[in-house]
Amino acid sequence: MEFNKLILTSTMAHFKSGINGKNQNTFRVPPISTIVGILKNIYGKEVKNFIFGYTCQYEDVFKDVNTIYKEVNLNITSAKGDRFQHDIAFIEYLINPTITIYTNLDVPIQINDILNLGKTNCLAKCKFEKENITLKECTGYNQWTPKNIGNGEIKRINKETIYNKNKGYYDYYTDLFRLNEEFMAKHMLEDAEEGIQLWQYKGVGDIECYQDNL
């Protein structure tokens, strides 16, 4: 079956791992929620009932040092004095990343917001191509899979992140997945002759492993 192939590139990417504000490490492979967010940005927030998979490559990892400010006294109008507290944060970035997304979405491209890879300073560009994917067992590399596939480390990651306007903060849909350096996939990218883990997005927070015929 022919899938849309989206090749996103940037000079750097940051997919925050954990909640430590001072040491902000990055996932080496973005969580599923990142890819869902990118697809909804490109094809529209209301898309559902589609299949997708993705891979991630990068050249190196770099840790930057930033000064962060927190407003602690709203009664002071001056930028000086005790209005702000500041500290340093160590932020980890993937250097020259390439994220390749495959999807069967067949709707017009919208691109509702600026494309970035995890942070607003990681601006990205996207190239659109095609790729055939078939139901054939093949070895896949460096991908998140269901926890019952492969031998990689199991972690809890976000499946989807939705901003809740009524609450004023984000709702997180999470689950346990396994990050495998190498695994046996049910589907194969015909051009690359490599395995790809496919997922089926049914609706908000409802994402399942897809292993059927295409």
Model-derived features: positions:
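Flexible, active-site-adjacent loop/turn segments at secondary-structure boundaries
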Residues: 13, 25-27, 92
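Primarily extracytoplasmic ectodomains and periplasmic/lumenal surface modules that are beta-strand-rich
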Residues: 13-14, 45-49, 108-109
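N-terminal, Lys/Arg- and Ser/Thr-rich interaction peptides
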Residues: 1-20
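Beta-strand secondary-structure signal
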Residues: 5-7, 53, 100-102
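Glycine/small-residue-rich interface belts in oligomeric ring/scaffold proteins
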Residues: 19-80
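Extracellular structured ligand-interaction cores
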Residues: 3, 49-51, 96-98
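Internal, well-folded beta-alpha domain core
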Residues: 59-214
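Residue-level detector of functional hotspots within protein domains
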Residues: 1, 13, 40, 85-89
